[in-house]
Amino acid sequence: MRSFQRGALDLRPVVLTPGVSRYAEGSVQVEFGHTKVLVTCSTEERVPPHLMGKGSGWVTAEYGMLPRATHSRNQRESAKGKQTGRTMEIQRLIGRSLRAAVDLSTLGPRTLTLDCDVLQADGGTRTASITGAYVALVLALRSLQKAGTISKLPKLTPLAAVSVGIVKGEVRVDLDYDEDSTADVDLNLVATADGRMVELQGTAEHQLFDRKALDAMVDGGLAAIQKLTAAQAQVLG
């Protein structure tokens, strides 16, 4: 039996709690079962050097885990003096995904930074981060509009992310830690509400997989993402 007595293609209970930060322009706490991530969106009136003078904006992300987000304490990466390759990979994925959600040319010369801090990890921290980051991004843009910084909201493309895998020969959606650590195939899918894929990362961990298995995983993931984007829409109103 899977956690939360769910079926193979069912998500864990998903909770999106907006406005959890007093100071950030946009914020949300996202929960995928026992995985909990705090996402804030901050705006700065500057852009990276490659965009200076072009009138375009930028969206980027940072990702990190609290020391006791896992079963045993991990030293803060800031104390180690450098980020791990995993951290850099995940925050780049989050940034790429959120740039696909907004028309950067309509942002003006400003940067929106999504900070994703894992409070508790039980698998799917990167997919939960992306799903929550979209909500935080929209809330931040609404704050900018309310303040008169931007005249209207940029064109937005709702998107979310979910993990999919093959565990014990079965395609499963939204893997928890125990499933993820034993999965034969592990896949992360980022896609829009209307089923267009932003990013697809799949790895044969313990066994090879064919096109039929890939299609089954993608189908299950896209169906789950429709549920996630519906949850986002409900929170955003």
Curated annotation (Swiss-Prot):
Record keywords, A-Z: Nucleotidyltransferase, RNA-binding, rRNA processing, Transferase, tRNA processing, tRNA-binding
Catalytic reactions on record: tRNA(n+1) + phosphate = tRNA(n) + a ribonucleoside 5'-diphosphate
Pfam families: RNase_PH (PF01138), RNase_PH_C (PF03725)
EC number, UniProt record: 2.7.7.56
GO biological process: rRNA catabolic process; rRNA processing; tRNA processing
Positions with a binding annotation for phosphate: 86, 124-126
PROSITE patterns named among the record's database cross-references: RIBONUCLEASE_PH (PS01277)
UniProt GO molecular function: 3'-5'-RNA exonuclease activity; tRNA binding; tRNA nucleotidyltransferase activity
Oligomer status and interactors: Homohexameric ring arranged as a trimer of dimers.
Family membership: Belongs to the RNase PH family.
Protein purpose: Phosphorolytic 3'-5' exoribonuclease that plays an important role in tRNA 3'-end maturation. Removes nucleotide residues following the 3'-CCA terminus of tRNAs; can also add nucleotides to the ends of RNA molecules by using nucleoside diphosphates as substrates, but this may not be physiologically important. Probably plays a role in initiation of 16S rRNA degradation (leading to ribosome degradation) during starvation.
NCBIfam families named in the record: RNasePH (TIGR01966)
Name of the protein this chain belongs to: Ribonuclease PH
Organism: Myxococcus xanthus (strain DK1622)
